[in-house]
UniProtKB/Swiss-Prot annotation:
Record organism: Drosophila persimilis
GO biological process: sperm individualization
Stated name of the protein: Male-specific protein scotti
Record-linked Pfam families: SOTI
Classification lineage: Eukaryota, Metazoa, Ecdysozoa, Arthropoda, Hexapoda
Positions of region (Disordered): 11-57
């Protein structure tokens, strides 16, 4: 740029506006230009403010793949084995559909129909005492 034109335009030396008390302009010198290799540093955007919120600047890792579950290792509900015979268990299952007021009658009818010599010949399979299968 032509120095005469530069003096006519009167560029501010430090970017703070038109400063007539600038010693460089009073002596007729050009303001110092930064070194050309430093241009890329001066043009760089400002860094984000530090220690404001450190969680905003954390780099999150990609999510880890979930472990595939095997049907052999998944837990199943444990069914408690009680001291109830198959006849008692089947009778209990049968009366679940009955209304609560008539469950006693349904139980008696079920035992009358199913606890007979056809289902249990010579009493084989019937419990001899409570808790025995």
């Amino acid at each position: 740029m032509d120095p005469r034109l530069y003096r006519l335009i009167r560029f501010p030396s430090n970017g703070l506006g038109n400063n007539n008390n600038d010693p460089n302009q009073q002596r007729g010198e050009r303001p110092r230009q930064p070194h050309p290799d430093l241009g890329w540093i001066l043009d760089a955007p400002n860094e984000p403010p530090r220690n404001r919120n450190p969680l905003l600047y954390l780099v999150t890792a990609p999510p880890r793949p979930r472990k595939k579950r095997s049907f052999m290792t998944t837990s199943k509900p444990f069914r408690i084995q009680t001291n109830v015979s198959d006849l008692q268990y089947n009778a209990w299952q049968a009366i679940q559909d009955a209304p609560p007021e008539k469950r006693c009658e349904y139980y008696v009818k079920y035992m009358d129909e199913h606890m007979n010599s056809q289902n249990y010949p010579n009493g084989v399979g019937l419990p001899h005492r409570w808790g025995q299968f």
